[in-house]
Curated annotation (Swiss-Prot):
It comes from Corynebacterium glutamicum (strain ATCC 13032 / DSM 20300 / JCM 1318 / BCRC 11384 / CCUG 27702 / LMG 3730 / NBRC 12168 / NCIMB 10025 / NRRL B-2784 / 534). One of its GO terms (biological process) is L-histidine biosynthetic process. This is Imidazole glycerol phosphate synthase subunit HisH. The gene is hisH. It is found in: Cytoplasm. The active site is at C82 (nucleophile), H192, E194.
Length: 211
């Protein structure tokens, strides 16, 4: 059975690139900002390009933060890409502007501590083992990044009653940052799987199979 993915249209992100990649991975894609469509699809993908503050304003204009929260409360899968991952955290701090995020994870998006920014191009990950997100992907695969900001500290506390998220790290120069998170029905990547060749295509297939 073909899975339906709502690609959230809130004025940010390369929708066509993401749509084509999802369709190649086997999904039926609906580009929409309609709350009913986005809430009822099998999966919701949240893209994002640009500044954290601008993306949050666009998201709130279409009630995207509520859509994300409602889906997760009901156990329905959501995936964020690039700034679409960043806005899932508590706060963004860019160019001196502090903005509240969706608050699904604690933590702050801040400027990377590196000489050369943006971090643009292909990079490896500290690849996890036994991860549904990275199933079928070689540990030495590279993924495509374009960003100057990221989450440099993971602060979510866990206990014996909950399954801890799978947090995947990468490094630009000597600065380590969160490259992906697999947290039950909430997946997210700082890199662009839709621009990451065969490895990115496999990751999207893994997500579609999961939903």
């Amino acid at each position: 059975m073909t899975k339906t993915v709502a690609l959230l249209d809130y004025g940010s992100g390369n929708l066509r690139s993401a749509q084509r990649a999802l369709e190649r991975a086997g999904a039926e894609v609906i580009v929409s900002s309609d709350p009913e469509v986005c809430t009822n699809a099998d999966g919701l993908l949240v893209p994002g390009v640009g500044a954290f503050d601008a993306c949050m304003k666009g998201l709130k204009n279409v009630f995207g933060h509520r859509i994300i929260g409602q889906r997760l409360a009901g156990g329905r899968p959501v995936m964020g890409i690039c700034v679409g991952m960043q806005i899932l955290f508590d706060e963004g701090d860019e160019h001196g502007i502090k903005s509240a995020g969706c608050g699904e994870w604690p933590g702050k998006v801040e400027r990377l501590q590196a000489e050369i920014l943006p971090h643009m191009g292909w990079n490896t990950l500290e690849m996890p083992t036994n991860s549904p997100m990275f199933e079928g992907i070689s540990p030495d695969e590279r993924f495509y990044f374009v960003h100057s900001y990221g989450v440099r500290k993971w602060t979510l506390e866990t206990d014996d009653l909950t399954t801890p998220p799978e947090v995947v790290w990468a490094k630009h120069e000597n600065d380590r940052f969160v490259a992906a998170v697999e947290n039950g029905t909430l997946w997210a990547t700082q890199f662009h799987p839709e621009k990451s060749g065969d490895a990115g295509a496999q990751l999207l297939r893994n997500w579609i199979n999961y939903i």
